[in-house]
């Protein structure tokens, strides 16, 4: 729907492998051509070809050689072959031979296991590698640690034979513009990773086809016509799948096909057309149509179910691996705004005796309210389980109404009379949801009737907006709740799931329901709550018209996909009454789009509305000219028919009254919690030769302003009220909430490079020799390059600084190594309590040193001082706490009390929760 295109921010077209591409800065010398043209493809000196330039995370620029897809490399006789190709082909041949040799009774389970193994290697195995490469550069760090790409002549690579093998394999595949010795380690690592991907993907597809062959059959009661139709449909789906893959590879090339942006970036503006204009994530959505085509040809539910499982696993791969990398790489938070735009309003009072111009008539009107025409700020979202708030009337009402509908549906019998009542109830709510809500929106669009009603009684347009959202939400809930209740009443459990197409109808119906849910979620993600509740009907200063998300491919996704679930219910129930409800719902939805949304969008946005969406453009380009003209004629007839109906309705339009409910303002916050680091306690047997006196930990932090020596509250005994008698010079360590803590460590010169320091509650570990509690990510390595991730190195300041024996305080005659690390951000506990640091040996959990216990405390306001406080003192008290809660990050933490937060605060809800907790404790 076009009204959904009024979102808050414009996003560019998809980039690498369906990504939103952010422009990459080019600062490397010698690439003036790139920066001048914005492209990374530059003609060589002969002018015969183009070269693509890549850029490593360290900024090194190199030429990306041309490569070919895996099918051509493996099967094309014109492509050079190497040992890895022979191994892959041999494994594929072994799969085929196994199908031929196995007994008929074991072929299906064996190949089901083989396929699931390769599918797991794809989605779980490759997914794990890519996830760690994206977050910790794990694959590149493995290559750096093993030095397999370093020339053995330097004496640093102990794997000379492996080096020669890899060099020969890669240079055989890329004969031009490639030098194994000169290529960056990121590029060489990617090439080796490609060979692993080739093996897994080829075995995955081959084993699936062999499994389908093992399961293939022809139903005994199937006619010739049905067989021809089944095979024809299957072949069409397979050919369509093949076209999707080929066209996608034409667009993204090998770089995105093999997840090259997990290793390096290319300085190139990519143009996305073809299949990428047809559907979101075409490689993972319509790119699996061939699986269902093969299922049709095999006529096997086993193949169908394993295809659905594989498709679901691929979407999980997209959600948990690719999408986080896309957001991190191509959609970073907006740049920090250091300036504040002040409103042109003077708050300086004027003297009564100063001359002034006479006030206008409008200014002399008492209590004349003025309202902003812009949309209200986001405070509290309405949709989604995370935004459920039982203190809100609309949320409580929705739950109670749904519970009532559910109770009536379950407790009443499924007699014809009750079935009629439930179907009639669903029809009434659908009519209200489309016709009633449409009438209200039409009046709001033409004369602001809804807003004027509330302003007439002294309310603000924001209050009218809140009441409208409640009305629309409760109407939507009742529309679908009543429809589900009617479907439940009309549904009868199958007596025989194997009879006819019963099972297939249920599978297809469930798929259509899932499609509608996905469509609704995609629409909401593109629109936000402002667009979902038709905010541009209520506020003139609507956000800029954009086409992103699902609207990049479809102008009105709810026209077909948005109602797929109701037709899924028709397939599942095979009921005439449900078919009537589905048909009525579809007709009313089309009328709502034509008579309510479309006129308003044309009036509001005019010529900025596009005529054809991405899918329509792709289909039109593929049609011959005669069919394109026919398409235009059909559109004209369709528009004229709707205009006639619109004129007919305008002559006899009923006057409807609108209901009222309540709702408050919305907020935007994305909660993404990173999984905790799970560790297993291990005791290192090689502790001989290490003296615990050589290990030590000293900590420094920002002292808390809260008093910690005299905590008497009057509840103690007489002796406990006496001043604390200290027999040493050490005072309790009390640090600010969220402030970084510096840890200085010492260790023997021969200490393990895999030593690490963890942060724990004092009460977490009863043993002082071995740590048996997970650090949950609150740990830092003492040396860089010792682990396969970068997170544990965040915070290292210095390592292995020599301390001569003469500077030791314990008079020992051994030199020591020392270093510093800083714990901050996610490596801290965001609560109050008493904590300690532990120094561990060799990547294990043997404790070599424990720091002094220290307390994290939030300073509280004295109740006696609160009446004397002014806003300035409150701001100055909260300011350091807020900065600590935002990790003192200059990109998000304010430098002054008037400066706004950075964009990342809105994306990650942990920052808001930290601030709320701290203010509550204060």
Curated annotation (Swiss-Prot):
Species assigned in the record: Aspergillus fumigatus (strain ATCC MYA-4609 / CBS 101355 / FGSC A1100 / Af293) (Neosartorya fumigata)
Cytoplasmic side: 107-109, 217-223, 299-300, 416-419, 495-496, 584-922
Cross-referenced PROSITE patterns: SAM_CHO2
Pfam families cross-referenced by the UniProt entry: PEMT
Biased composition annotated in UniProt, kind: Basic and acidic residues: 11-20
Region (Disordered): 1-59, 346-375, 701-722
Enzyme type, top EC level: transferase
Top-level taxon of the source organism: Eukaryota
Family from the record: Belongs to the class VI-like SAM-binding methyltransferase superfamily. CHO2 family.
Gene Ontology MF terms in the entry: phosphatidylethanolamine N-methyltransferase activity
Gene: cho2
This protein's GO CC annotations: cortical endoplasmic reticulum; endoplasmic reticulum membrane; perinuclear endoplasmic reticulum
Transmembrane segments: 86-106, 110-130, 196-216, 224-244, 278-298, 301-321, 396-415, 420-442, 474-494, 497-517, 563-583
Subcellular compartments: Endoplasmic reticulum membrane
Keyword annotations from UniProtKB, A to Z: Endoplasmic reticulum, Lipid biosynthesis, Lipid metabolism, Membrane, Methyltransferase, Phospholipid biosynthesis, Phospholipid metabolism, S-adenosyl-L-methionine, Transferase, Transmembrane, Transmembrane helix
Spans within the Lumenal topological domain: 1-85, 131-195, 245-277, 322-395, 443-473, 518-562
EC code: 2.1.1.17
Protein name in UniProt: Phosphatidylethanolamine N-methyltransferase
Positions with biased composition (Polar residues): 346-357
GO biological process, alphabetically ordered: methylation; phosphatidylcholine biosynthetic process
Pathway: Phospholipid metabolism; phosphatidylcholine biosynthesis
Enzymatic reactions: a 1,2-diacyl-sn-glycero-3-phosphoethanolamine + S-adenosyl-L-methionine = a 1,2-diacyl-sn-glycero-3-phospho-N-methylethanolamine + S-adenosyl-L-homocysteine + H(+)
């Amino acid at each position: 729907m076009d009204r959904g295109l009024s979102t808050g921010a414009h996003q560019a077209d998809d980039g690498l492998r369906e990504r939103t591409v952010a422009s990459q800065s080019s600062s490397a010398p010698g690439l003036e051509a790139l920066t001048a043209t914005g492209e990374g493809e530059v003609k060589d000196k002969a002018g015969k070809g183009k070269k693509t330039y890549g850029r490593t995370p360290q900024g090194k620029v190199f030429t990306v050689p041309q490569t070919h897809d895996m099918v051509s490399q493996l099967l094309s006789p014109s492509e050079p072959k190497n040992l890895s190709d022979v191994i892959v082909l041999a494994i594929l041949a072994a799969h085929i031979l196994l199908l031929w040799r196995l007994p008929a009774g074991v072929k299906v389970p064996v190949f089901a296991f083989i396929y699931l193994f390769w599918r797991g290697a794809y989605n779980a195995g490759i997914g794990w590698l890519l996830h760690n490469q994206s977050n910790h550069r794990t694959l590149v760090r493995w290559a750096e640690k093993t030095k397999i790409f370093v020339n053995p002549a330097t004496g640093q690579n102990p794997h000379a034979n492996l080096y020669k093998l890899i060099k020969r394999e890669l240079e055989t595949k890329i004969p031009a513009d490639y030098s194994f010795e000169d290529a960056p380690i990121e590029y060489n690592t990617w090439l080796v990773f490609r060979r692993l991907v080739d093996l897994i993907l080829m075995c995955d597809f081959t084993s699936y086809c062999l499994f389908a062959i093992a399961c293939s059959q022809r139903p005994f009661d199937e006619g010739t016509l049905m067989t021809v139709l089944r095979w024809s449909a299957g072949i069409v789906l397979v050919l369509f799948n093949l076209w999707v893959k080929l066209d996608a590879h034409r667009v993204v090339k090998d770089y995105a096909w093999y997840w090259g942006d997990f290793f390096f970036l290319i300085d190139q503006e990519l143009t996305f057309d073809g299949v990428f204009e047809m559907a979101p994530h075409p490689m993972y959505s319509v790119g699996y149509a061939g699986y269902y085509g093969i299922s049709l040809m095999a006529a096997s539910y086993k193949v169908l179910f394993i295809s659905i499982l594989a498709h679901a696993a691929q979407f999980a791969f997209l959600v948990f691996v690719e999408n986080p990398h896309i957001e991190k790489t191509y959609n970073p938070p907006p740049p920090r705004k250091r300036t504040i735009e002040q409103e042109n309003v003077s708050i300086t009072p004027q003297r009564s005796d100063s001359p002034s111009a006479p006030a206008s008539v409008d200014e002399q009107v008492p209590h004349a309210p003025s309202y902003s025409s812009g949309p209200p700020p986001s405070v509290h979202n309405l949709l989604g389980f995370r935004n459920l708030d039982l203190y809100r009337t609309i949320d409580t009402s929705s739950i109670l109404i749904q519970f009532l509908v559910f109770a009536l549906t379950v407790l009443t019998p499924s007699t014809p009379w009750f079935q009629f009542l439930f179907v009639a109830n669903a029809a009434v709510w659908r009519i209200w949801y489309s016709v009633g809500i449409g009438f209200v929106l039409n009046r709001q669009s033409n004369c602001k009737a809804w807003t004027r009603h509330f302003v007439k009684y002294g309310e603000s347009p924001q209050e009218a907006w809140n009441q409208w959202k409640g009305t629309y939400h409760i109407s939507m809930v009742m529309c679908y709740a009543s429809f589900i209740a009617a479907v439940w009443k009309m549904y009868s459990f199958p007596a025989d799931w194997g009879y006819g197409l019963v099972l297939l109808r249920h599978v297809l119906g469930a798929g259509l329901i899932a499609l509608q849910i996905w469509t609704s979620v995609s629409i909401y993600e593109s629109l936000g709550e402002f667009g979902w509740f038709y905010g541009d009907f209520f506020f003139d200063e609507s956000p800029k018209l954009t086409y992103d998300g699902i609207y990049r491919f479809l102008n009105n996704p709810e026209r077909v996909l948005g109602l797929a679930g109701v037709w899924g219910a028709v397939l599942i129930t095979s009921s005439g009454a449900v078919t009537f409800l589905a048909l009525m719902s579809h007709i009313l939805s089309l009328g709502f789009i034509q008579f309510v949304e479309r006129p308003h969008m044309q009036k509001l946005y005019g010529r900025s509305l596009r005529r054809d969406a991405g899918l329509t453009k792709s289909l039109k380009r593929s049609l011959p000219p005669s069919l394109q003209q026919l398409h235009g004629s059909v559109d004209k007839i369709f528009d004229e028919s709707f205009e006639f109906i619109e004129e007919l309705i305008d002559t006899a339009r009923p006057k409807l009254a609108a209901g009222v409910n309540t709702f408050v303002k919305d907020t935007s916050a994305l909660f993404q919690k990173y999984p905790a680091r799970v560790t297993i306690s291990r005791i290192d047997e090689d502790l001989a030769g290490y003296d615990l006196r050589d290990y030590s930990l000293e900590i420094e932090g920002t002292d808390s302003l809260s008093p910690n020596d005299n905590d008497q509250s009057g509840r103690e005994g007489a002796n406990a009220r006496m001043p604390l008698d200290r027999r040493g010079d050490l005072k309790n360590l009390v640090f600010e909430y969220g402030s970084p803590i510096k840890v200085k460590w010492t260790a023997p010169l021969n200490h393990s490079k895999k030593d690490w320091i963890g942060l724990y509650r004092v009460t977490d570990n009863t043993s002082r020799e071995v740590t048996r509690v997970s650090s949950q990510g609150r740990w830092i390595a003492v040396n860089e390059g010792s682990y396969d991730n970068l997170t544990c190195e965040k915070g290292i300041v210095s390592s292995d600084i020599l301390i001569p024996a003469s500077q030791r305080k314990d008079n020992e005659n051994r030199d020591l190594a020392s270093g510093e690390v800083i714990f901050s951000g996610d490596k801290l506990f965001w609560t109050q309590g008493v904590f300690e640091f532990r120094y561990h040996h060799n990547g294990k959990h043997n404790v070599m040193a424990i720091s002094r216990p220290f307390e994290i405390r939030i300073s509280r306001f004295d109740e006696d001082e609160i009446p004397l406080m002014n806003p300035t003192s409150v701001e100055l008290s909260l300011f350091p706490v807020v900065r600590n809660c935002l990790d003192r990050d200059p990109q998000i933490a304010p430098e002054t009390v008037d400066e706004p937060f950075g964009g990342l605060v809105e994306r990650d809800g942990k920052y808001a929760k930290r601030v709320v907790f701290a203010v509550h404790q204060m």
